[in-house]
Amino acid sequence: MQPLYEGKAKRLYTTQDQDVLRIVYKDEATAFNGEKKAEFAGKGELNNRLTSHFFEVLAAAGIPTHFIEQTSEREQLVRRVTIIPLEVVVRNVVAGSLSKRLGIEEGTVLETPIVEFYYKDDSLGDPLVTPAHINLLKIATTEELSLLEQEANRVNDVLRPYFDEKGITLIDFKLEYGKTPAGEILLADEISPDTCRLWDKETGEHLDKDVFRRNIGSLIDTYQTLFNRLGGNGQ
């Protein structure tokens, strides 16, 4: 097992199968493109278990992902993909940068979900980009971009009612996609409270990384609460 890549929240390693990678989830939390950092014992285990569970939920709904299996509390095996340098953000309720950018009050429910694309480049601050920008940058074809939007909406159609049944509102979330050597586009990266905004339907309590971003609560306690609310799934 050789190290391949280390990101803000995960380490990637090769395996004996060239088409399979091992992901190890770290305890580090970051915000504001890495400007704010801290470590929380147990975070990696919680995110691994939650991500594994969400990918299983999506796979059961017929959505193709890179996930193969969870192999330990902190590790999982995934199909090897080349990440498309776009963050695909799906918004159901106004929050975060959308509120600041358009001057709309946080908590405003959108009539229909909004899908946005952000160029994955830390040096540029991951800017919001339009289809014309994406074409200019040669990141994805028009057909691929249409597929990404369609697939992101499919993920939303599965996860939104899933959380709703648990008394949680899926405010917004970030997805990343990658291509297999054969050119198949798969949902990749992770789905966790690091990448989703989740609010308690009754109290409005944040059940995601915003407690760290905004210094409004304990990250580990929040993630553990979410894990428990979902029935302790992820094994």
Curated annotation (Swiss-Prot):
Pfam families: SAICAR_synt. It catalyses: 5-amino-1-(5-phospho-D-ribosyl)imidazole-4-carboxylate + L-aspartate + ATP = (2S)-2-[5-amino-1-(5-phospho-beta-D-ribosyl)imidazole-4-carboxamido]succinate + ADP + phosphate + 2 H(+). InterPro entries: SAICAR_synt/ADE2_N, SAICAR_synt_PurC, SAICAR_synth, SAICAR_synthetase, SAICAR_synthetase_CS. GO terms for biological process: 'de novo' IMP biosynthetic process; cobalamin biosynthetic process. Its EC number is 6.3.2.6. Keywords: ATP-binding, Ligase, Nucleotide-binding, Purine biosynthesis. Pathway: Purine metabolism; IMP biosynthesis via de novo pathway; 5-amino-1-(5-phospho-D-ribosyl)imidazole-4-carboxamide from 5-amino-1-(5-phospho-D-ribosyl)imidazole-4-carboxylate: step 1/2. It comes from the Bacteria. One of its GO terms (molecular function) is phosphoribosylaminoimidazolesuccinocarboxamide synthase activity. Belongs to the SAICAR synthetase family. PANTHER family: MULTIFUNCTIONAL PROTEIN ADE2, SI:DKEY-6E2.2. This is Phosphoribosylaminoimidazole-succinocarboxamide synthase. It comes from Exiguobacterium sibiricum (strain DSM 17290 / CCUG 55495 / CIP 109462 / JCM 13490 / 255-15).
